[in-house]
Amino acid sequence: MNIPQYITNDEVKRVCKEMKLKDWTKKKDAKVTADEARAVMSVVNTEKMAIPLEAFRRGLEVELEHGTRFNDANVTNNHPVVTGRIVLAHLKETMDYYQRLEVAELEGDLFKAVKSADMQKVAKYFRKLSKAKLELNRLEAKAAK
């Protein structure tokens, strides 16, 4: 099946230019600056939901990772507004969405390391997972107050 490109490079370039962002069609990695995140959030957060800038920035990086790492899974073609709306939708579900996702991904990485009997990777992912769980626990405790 021939799958069309629903969001064209020209459209992404147009939006980036209008938003005064670098051309996101040329992104080689998922890094997003605080200024870029602020610009995107100001466009998509029309209801002025209280979103910490770092949470939004981190979400953009996670969502952009799909396209920068896996070309065949680039849902948004790195379109800043469409990507930002995906982040906003997840944060509306739960503000700790991306911390929960990080824990789940690290649990998967740890499982693969254990399965391969690579003890260096096991130790590395165990440390990362412990840190991610601690951060999530802090967020949950703060939200429970």
What are these regions (language model features)?
Residues M1-M19:
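Intrinsically disordered, low-structural-confidence terminal and linker regions
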Residues V12, A37, V87:
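Generic structural marker for isolated residues within well-ordered, non-membrane alpha-helices
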Residues W24, M49, N71-N77:
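Charged, low-complexity interaction regions
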Residues D29:
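Non-catalytic nucleic-acid-binding interfaces of large nucleic-acid enzymes and RNP effectors
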Residues A34-F70, V81-G84, D96, E107, ...:
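Flexible, glycine-rich loop/tail regions that form catalytic "lids" or insertion modules at the edges
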Residues N74-D109:
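Amphipathic alpha-helical packing elements
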Residues L101-A123:
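Short linear, low-complexity motifs centered on an aromatic residue
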Residues L110, V122-Y125, L129-L139, A143:
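Long amphipathic alpha-helices with heptad-repeat character
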